[in-house]
C-alpha cells in the first residue's frame, strides 16, 4: 500500500464515518495526505484529518479520531490506528500491505512513479537559450541540467513537453561578436565592448579556413561573413557541448526569424489595435502596468527600432499559435524583470497570464581548495560547461546542478564532487545502485530466482523504513513536477540510498556457506530489486547514469 493508496483509503473511511453519523461529508478535502512521522515508533504514517474536519462538523477532534481509528483498524491492510495528542492518527500498516509496495514496483518497472496529473497538457519548456557569442557558462549549465530534468519529470506526469532553445541571433551582441572575430583574424586586440578568449581566435581561424579571401572583402561584406559563419560555428559548438552533456532540444527557434517574417511588426500592430500600446516621446509603450507589471515597457523606441521586448512578445505569440497550454521560461538571476513583462504581454493579448511561468535561477560558483575558480582555459573570463565536465564529469556536473533549489546560489566544490566517498552525493546514490546490481549478479550466480516472495516476512525496522521510503517515490515525482523542482528527486534519492545502506548493514540478504535459500532471502532479494528499480528510475529523471559496477 503506497501513501497515495492509504490516503485514498483514509478519505473513503472518513466519508463513511461521517455519513453513518449524519455529518456533512462535503467538508472533507478532495485529497487527504498522510505523512511519515519523524519517530518511526509512532507508526508508519500519520494524519491530522480529524483536526481538519472536526470543527466543521461540530464534534471534538479526538472523538472523530476515535471513530476513524476504529473504522481504519477494521480495514484490510491496516495493522493499527492510534490517537495521539489533540487528534492526530498514527497508522501502522500490516506487513503484507506494506510489502505490496515492493510488488507494485517490480510489476511497473520503469513506469513506477509515473502519473496523470498533467495528462493532455502541452508545455513549451524554454531553457539555456544562451547567446551564440561564446561557450555556455555555469549559469547556462545549471539551466541545461535542471531544464532537461524538469522536462523528463513533466513527461512522467502525462504532459507533452517541447524542449526549446531560443537562438538570439538578432541584436547588438552579434555585431560585437563579429567585430571580435575580425579583430582576432587581423591579430588585433578585441574591441572594448567585444569578446575575448582563445575560442574567438579558434572561430576566426575557422572562418578564414572556409573563406580565405574574407579579409580582402569590403568592411560591410567582411563583417557579414564573419557574422554568418562565426555564429553558425559557435552554435554548432554549443549544440555539440549540450548533446555530450545529455541535453537535446526539439526546437531551435531563431529570434531573427521573428523580424524577417514580420511577426514582430504584426504583434505590435495587434497591440496598437487593441489599445494596449500608447505613444509618448516618439516611442510606443506597452501598458504593462495595467496588467500587474511594475512599469510600462518601451516596445518600439523613438528611433523606430524594436526594443528587446518586441521580440519577446512576438515569440510568445508564436508559441501560443503552436497550441501550447503553458509556456515555461527558465531565466538567469538578472532576469527578474521579465516575469512581470512576459505575463503582462500575455494579458495584453487576452491570454491568461498564468499561461506564462518564469523560473529564475541563482548564481553558480566553482570552488577549489576553498577558493573560487574564476578563469577558464578556453573562454578567458568565465567558467564554462566544458570546464566543469572536464573537472568532475557529466554525472557529477548534472547532479551538482540539480540537487539544490534554483532559488539558491550554489558553490560546486571540485574536491567534493570528485571524491569517492559518502560525502559525495552522486557517488553515494550511484554506489547504492552498483551495490544492488552486484547483489542481483551474485544471486543469479547462485541460481536464486525471486519467485513468489512473502513480503509479510519483512518486519525489521530497516526493512520497514526502506519499504516506506520506496513508497514515497511517486509522491515525490508528482511534487517535483507540480512545483517545477527537480531537486526534490535528487534529495529523495539520497534518502533512499541511506535507507538502503542501513538495510544492507543490518539484514543479511544472500545465504552464506551451506545455508539453504529460504523465504526471507527471497523476500529481501525482491526488496533489493525494487530498490534498484527506483534508484534507476530516479537517476534517469535527472539524466544521470545508474552504474552496474563502481
Swiss-Prot record:
It is found in: Cytoplasm. It catalyses: tRNA(Arg) + L-arginine + ATP = L-arginyl-tRNA(Arg) + AMP + diphosphate. One of its GO terms (biological process) is arginyl-tRNA aminoacylation. Coiled coil: none annotated. SMART domains: Arg_tRNA_synt_N, DALR_1. One of its GO terms (cellular component) is cytoplasm. Keywords: Aminoacyl-tRNA synthetase, ATP-binding, Cytoplasm, Ligase, Nucleotide-binding, Protein biosynthesis. The keyword Cell inner membrane does not apply. GO terms for molecular function: arginine-tRNA ligase activity; ATP binding. Its main location: cytoplasm. The keyword Glycoprotein does not apply. Its EC number is 6.1.1.19. InterPro entries: aa-tRNA-synth_I_CS, Arg-tRNA-ligase, Arg-tRNA-synth_N, Arg-tRNA-synth_N_sf, ArgRS_core, DALR_anticod-bd, Rossmann-like_a/b/a_fold, tRNAsynth_Ia_anticodon-bd. A motif ('HIGH' region) lies at residues 130-140. Pfam families: Arg_tRNA_synt_N (PF03485), DALR_1 (PF05746), tRNA-synt_1d (PF00750). Monomer. Belongs to the class-I aminoacyl-tRNA synthetase family. This is Arginine--tRNA ligase. It comes from Rhodococcus jostii (strain RHA1).
Amino acid at each position: 500500500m503506497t501513501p497515495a493508496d492509504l490516503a485514498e483509503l483514509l478519505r473513503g473511511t472518513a466519508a463513511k464515518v461521517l455519513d453513518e453519523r449524519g455529518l456533512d461529508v462535503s467538508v472533507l478535502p478532495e485529497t487527504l495526505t498522510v505523512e511519515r512521522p519523524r519517530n518511526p515508533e509512532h507508526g508508519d504514517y500519520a494524519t491530522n484529518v480529524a483536526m481538519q474536519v472536526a470543527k466543521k462538523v461540530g464534534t471534538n477532534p479526538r472523538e472523530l479520531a476515535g471513530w476513524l481509528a476504529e473504522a481504519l483498524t477494521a480495514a484490510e491492510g491496516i495493522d493499527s490506528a492510534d490517537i495521539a495528542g489533540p487528534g492526530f492518527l498514527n497508522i501502522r500498516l500490516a506487513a503484507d500491505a506494506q510489502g505490496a509496495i515492493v510488488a507494485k514496483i517490480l510489476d511497473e518497472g520503469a513506469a513506477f512513479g509515473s502519473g496523470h496529473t498533467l495528462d493532455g497538457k502541452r508545455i513549451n519548456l524554454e531553457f539555456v537559450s544562451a547567446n551564440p557569442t561564446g561557450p555556455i557558462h555555469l549559469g547556462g549549465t545549471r539551466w541545461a541540467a535542471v531544464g532537461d530534468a524538469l522536462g523528463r519529470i513533466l513527461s512522467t506526469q502525462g504532459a507533452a513537453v517541447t524542449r526549446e532553445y531560443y537562438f538570439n541571433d538578432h541584436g547588438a551582441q552579434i555585431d560585437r561578436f563579429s567585430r571580435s572575430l575580425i579583430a582576432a583574424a587581423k591579430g588585433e586586440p578585441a574591441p572594448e565592448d567585444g569578446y575575448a578568449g582563445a575560442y574567438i581566435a579558434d572561430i576566426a581561424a575557422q572562418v578564414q579556413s572556409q573563406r580565405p579571401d574574407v579579409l580582402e572583402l569590403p568592411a560591410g561584406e567582411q563583417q557579414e561573413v564573419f557574422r554568418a559563419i562565426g555564429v553558425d560555428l559557435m552554435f554548432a559548438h554549443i549544440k555539440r557541448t549540450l548533446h555530450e552533456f545529455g541535453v537535446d532540444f526539439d526546437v531551435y527557434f531563431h529570434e531573427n526569424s521573428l523580424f524577417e517574417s514580420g511577426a514582430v511588426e504584426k504583434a505590435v500592430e495587434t497591440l496598437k489595435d487593441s489599445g494596449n500600446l500608447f505613444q509618448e516621446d516618439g516611442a510606443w509603450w506597452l501598458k504593462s502596468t495595467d496588467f500587474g507589471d511594475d512599469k510600462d515597457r518601451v516596445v518600439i523606441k523613438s528611433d523606430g527600432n524594436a526594443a528587446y521586448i518586441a521580440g519577446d512578445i512576438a515569440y510568445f505569440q508564436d508559441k501560443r499559435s503552436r497550441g501550447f497550454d503553458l509556456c515555461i521560461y527558465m531565466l538567469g538571476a538578472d532576469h527578474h524583470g521579465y516575469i512581470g513583462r512576459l505575463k503582462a504581454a500575455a494579458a495584453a493579448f487576452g491570454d491568461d497570464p498564468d499561461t506564462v511561468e518564469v523560473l529564475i535561477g541563482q548564481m553558480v560558483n566553482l570552488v577549489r581548495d576553498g577558493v573560487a575558480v574564476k578563469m577558464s582555459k578556453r573562454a578567458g573570463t568565465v567558467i564554462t560547461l566544458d570546464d566543469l565536465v572536464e573537472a568532475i564529469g557529466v554525472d557529477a556536473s548534472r547532479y551538482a546542478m540539480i540537487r539544490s533549489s534554483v532559488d539558491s546560489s550554489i558553490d560546486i566544490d571540485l574536491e567534493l564532487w570528485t571524491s569517492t566517498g559518502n560525502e559525495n552525493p552522486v557517488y553515494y546514490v550511484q554506489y547504492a545502485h552498483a551495490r544492488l546490481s552486484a547483489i542481483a549478479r551474485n544471486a543469479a550466480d547462485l541460481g536464486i530466482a525471486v519467485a513468489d516472495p512473502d513480503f509479510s516476512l519483512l518486519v525489521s525496522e530497516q526493512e520497514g523504513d526502506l519499504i516506506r521510503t520506496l513508497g514515497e517515490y511517486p509522491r515525490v515525482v508528482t511534487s517535483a513536477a507540480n512545483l517545477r523542482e527537480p531537486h526534490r528527486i535528487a534529495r529523495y534519492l539520497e534518502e533512499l540510498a541511506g535507507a538502503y545502506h542501513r538495510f544492507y548493514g543490518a539484514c543479511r540478504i544472500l545465504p552464506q556457506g551451506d545455508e539453504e535459500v529460504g523465504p526471507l532471502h527471497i523476500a529481501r532479494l525482491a526488496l533489493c530489486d525494487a530498490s534498484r528499480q527506483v534508484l534507476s528510475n530516479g537517476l534517469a529523471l535527472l539524466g544521470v547514469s545508474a552504474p552496474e559496477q563502481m
